[in-house]
């Protein structure tokens, strides 16, 4: 079915990554497995082997396929890689396909929905926890993590084969462009006034107490702006 897609190459990819022990930080890629479906060529890269550009094509004539692509594209950004030109996110397309019908829309849910062999949920969690632990990993653990990543790629290949006939490709590619934008938002974070935020954290208890007192008194008053060195 993938051969019917109007692209010279179709690349399915998955990253494993961790956050340096701090949730919310930028991803730190651990490994990547990718497969070009027309030729069957596969790439397996471990941390330190990534290089300055992806090892596979990402131009206009290549379809880049992922599940929840903002995560994979976040790894692209962390590595300084350019964005793929054509992106298909099967997570987004599955959500669109079952909109209003299912509340669970992860990779295992998508595979089960289409009657495909799915990964074991317990094993998936164990491997994800192993990766998020941040290492160091033994040689055996490295092999296991890469093999786990490769199984996700194989699962995506199966999922693409059954979802391809349901795709509204022009709109799907537009949604893929949005996931690239979402990865930029996640990479850059939300800009905030850090000094004022620090003051809020420092005086939060006092602020709450004064607001409660004002509420109980039925009164409101002008509040002076928070400035460094002054409590509210």
PLM feature segments, named:
Residues 1-16, 25-26, 31, 40, ...:
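Conserved "right-hand" nucleotidyltransferase catalytic core of DNA-directed polymerases
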Residues 3-7, 55-61:
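Flexible, charged surface loops at secondary-structure boundaries
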Residues 15-22, 68:
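Ser/Thr-glycine-rich phosphate-binding loops at phosphate-binding pockets of nucleotides
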Residues 18-21, 53-54, 62:
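Short secondary-structure capping/turn segments at boundaries of alpha-helices and beta-strands
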Residues 22-25, 102:
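Short glycine-biased active-site loop of nucleotidyltransferases that positions the nucleotide triphosphate
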Residues 30, 34, 38-51, 61-164:
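Active-site-proximal helix-loop-helix substrate-binding element of RNase H-like nuclease domains
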Residues 49-56, 218-221:
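Glycine-rich loop/turn
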């Amino acid at each position: 079915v993938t051969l019917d897609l109007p692209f010279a190459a179709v690349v399915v990819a998955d990253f494993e990554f961790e956050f340096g022990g701090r949730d919310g930080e930028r991803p730190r890629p651990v490994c990547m497995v990718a497969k070009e479906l027309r030729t069957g060529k596969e790439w397996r890269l471990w941390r330190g082997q990534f290089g300055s550009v992806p090892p596979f094509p990402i131009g206009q004539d290549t379809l880049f396929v992922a599940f929840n692509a903002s995560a994979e594209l976040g790894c692209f950004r962390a590595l300084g890689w350019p964005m793929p030109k054509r992106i298909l996110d099967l997570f987004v397309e599955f959500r669109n396909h079952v909109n209003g019908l299912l509340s669970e829309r992860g990779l295992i849910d998508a595979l089960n929905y289409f009657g495909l062999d799915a990964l074991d949920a317990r094993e998936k969690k164990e491997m994800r926890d192993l990766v998020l632990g941040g290492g160091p990993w033994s040689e055996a653990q490295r092999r296991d993590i890469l093999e786990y990543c490769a199984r996700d790629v194989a699962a995506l290949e199966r999922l693409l084969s059954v979802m391809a006939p349901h795709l509204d490709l022009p709109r799907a590619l537009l949604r893929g462009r949005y996931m690239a934008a979402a990865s930029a938002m996640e990479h850059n974070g939300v800009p905030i006034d850090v000094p004022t935020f620090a003051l809020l954290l420092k005086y939060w208890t006092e602020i709450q107490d004064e607001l409660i007192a004002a509420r109980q008194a039925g009164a409101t008053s002008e509040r002076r702006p928070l400035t460094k060195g002054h409590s509210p």
